[in-house]
């Protein structure tokens, strides 16, 4: 596929989703079943409006069914399913057009996801695409009966171990995904969709008190230092503001945000997307907290010249300004979080560093920590 986007001064090649692969294979298999002749290529237009012509491989034809595969191409995106073959077997049925999952396709075991409990983890858009394309082939050949498409990915069980599927309650394989049909490298929308899916799952389970953490540092601190488990934890990456918004939309009661100073210090200046591409402001925020805590311009200047927040913490520690500066920072973080969340959801934060442990907590953080500890 030769379509590109430009991000961070890089030219990145687009790819296509497992959903597009399944839809293309379903169309090809239906056409071969009804027409009786093998095809080498299949054409379709993705929901994003991009036309594709994809090679059809691993064809197995019989009177009752046809199986074929389309190879997933994720472009320049890192994707565990890149290079996987998505197989579809199409067979005739009395009436209607059906889709299901076979080998390597997960099954939904928890409510709140795109598909109901018990269904194959094939999302709505790929299902719709498969049905529409099979109907199109039936019309082309004047076929008035029904067709059923079963999707399989032989390596799906192994691939699923490198995804969030098990945590989301999708067991036994991967999901067939895609809303636009196109994989966009470094897609923020895809990450936010994953966060939304986790929140939706917890909402459907009636779990209204969650821990959120930007990444692996936070998860490690939770388990090793705070003795909290990860069962009710959502990894929000850099999208703290959007996670808060979505949690409010799902009617969550509380969020406990736990993260490294290097990320959460930005909240002290109201920066709710903590990716360095969006904004920095780490040292400026800490320097202003030093001034608010009674420090002088020389100390603030030393903070501004630090390369990392760990370096800044070291300076504050040796000058006995760590605690007062962190108190000022936590006041600002508390204000920013509560302003974003509004009055309907409680939100608290814990900030830590790898060397010095907990650096600060918002006023109600300890209460939420105890709430989560009681579930251990």
Where are these regions (language model features)?
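Generic N-terminal targeting/processing segments that precede catalytic cores or assembly contacts
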Residues: 1-162, 166-168
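A structural signal for small-residue-enriched, beta-sheet-centric alpha/beta enzyme cores
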Residues: 3-6, 13, 168-174, 179-198, ...
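Surface-exposed flexible segments
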Residues: 83-87, 225-228, 362-368
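Generic domain-boundary/flexible-linker signal
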Residues: 110, 160, 221, 266-268, ...
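Short, amphipathic C-terminal "tail helix"
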Residues: 346-376
């Amino acid at each position: 596929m030769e379509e590109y986007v430009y991000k961070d001064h890089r030219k990145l090649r687009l790819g296509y989703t497992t959903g597009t692969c399944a839809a293309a294979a379903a169309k090809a298999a239906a056409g071969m079943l009804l027409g009786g002749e093998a095809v080498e290529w299949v054409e379709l237009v993705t929901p994003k409006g991009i036309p594709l012509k994809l090679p059809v491989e691993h064809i197995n034809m019989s009177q009752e069914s046809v199986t074929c595969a389309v190879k997933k191409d994720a472009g320049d995106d890192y994707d565990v399913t890149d290079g996987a073959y998505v197989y579809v077997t199409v067979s005739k049925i009395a009436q209607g057009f059906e889709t299901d999952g076979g080998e390597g396709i997960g099954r939904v075991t928890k409510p709140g996801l795109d598909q109901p409990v018990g269904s194959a983890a094939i999302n709505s858009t790929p299902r719709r695409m498969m049905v529409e394309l099979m109907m199109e082939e039936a019309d082309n050949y004047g076929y008035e009966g029904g067709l059923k498409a079963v999707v399989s990915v032989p390596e799906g069980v192994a691939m699923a171990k490198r995804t969030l599927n098990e945590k989301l309650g999708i067991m036994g394989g991967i999901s067939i995904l895609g809303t636009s049909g196109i994989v966009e490298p470094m897609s923020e929308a895809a990450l936010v969709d994953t966060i939304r899916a986790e929140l939706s799952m917890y909402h459907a389970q009636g779990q209204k008190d969650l821990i959120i953490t930007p990444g692996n540092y936070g998860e490690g601190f939770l388990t090793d230092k705070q003795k909290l488990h990860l069962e009710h934890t959502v990894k929000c990456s850099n999208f703290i503001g959007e996670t808060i918004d979505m949690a409010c939309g799902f009617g969550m009661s509380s969020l406990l945000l736990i993260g490294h100073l290097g990320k959460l210090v930005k909240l002290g200046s109201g920066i709710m997307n903590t990716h360095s591409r969006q904004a920095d402001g780490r040292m400026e925020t800490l320097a202003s907290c030093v001034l608010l805590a009674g420090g002088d311009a020389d100390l603030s200047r030393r903070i501004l010249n630090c390369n990392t927040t760990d370096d800044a913490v070291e300076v504050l520690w040796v000058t006995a300004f760590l605690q007062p500066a962190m108190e000022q920072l936590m006041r600002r973080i508390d204000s920013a979080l509560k302003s974003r969340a509004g009055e309907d959801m409680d939100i608290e934060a814990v900030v830590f560093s790898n060397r010095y442990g907990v650096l600060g907590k918002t006023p109600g953080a300890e209460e939420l920590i105890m709430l989560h500890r009681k579930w251990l």
